[in-house]
Every structure is written in C-alpha cells, then in structure tokens.
Amino acid sequence: MACMEIDPGKEDAEHQHPFEQCGVVVEGKIEMFIGDVRRILEAMDTYFIPAGVLHGWKTFDVPARILDVSAK
C-alpha cells in the first residue's frame, strides 16, 4: 500500500504488472488509462487494474493524492 502525491501536469507511461492493483483518489483529479478505458477520477473515486492489463495515468492542473494497493 502506498500514498502517492503526484504533482500537476505529470504523466506515467503505459505499463503493466503481473498482479492486481486498486486504489482510491484522496484529493485532486487524475485521468486513468486501464486497458482501452479512460476515466477521469476525483476525490473518493476508486479504480481497479487487473493483472497484466496495460495502464497509466496523467494529472491535470492540480496535484492528486491517491491511496494505491498492489496485491502481490
């Protein structure tokens, strides 16, 4: 489990893991790319990333804080 604080205007390249991942946006706004689905998430929105699925994210003009859990 990790609490990630991400600065505005950042982007994570598309990647994948051999384990499931999920989390909740604590504050701010972030766009998540999970497989072919793109979602804009704000405070209290949750996400789930199945094992082996390509995913990534980008922030907007405000920072984002997310609580992220990896099921290794």
What kind of region is each of these model predictions?
Residues M1, E20, D61:
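Short coil/loop residues immediately preceding or within conserved phosphate-binding loops
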Residues D12-H17, K58-T59:
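Short histidine-centered beta-strand/loop micro-motifs
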Residues K29-E31, R38, L54, P63:
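Structural motif
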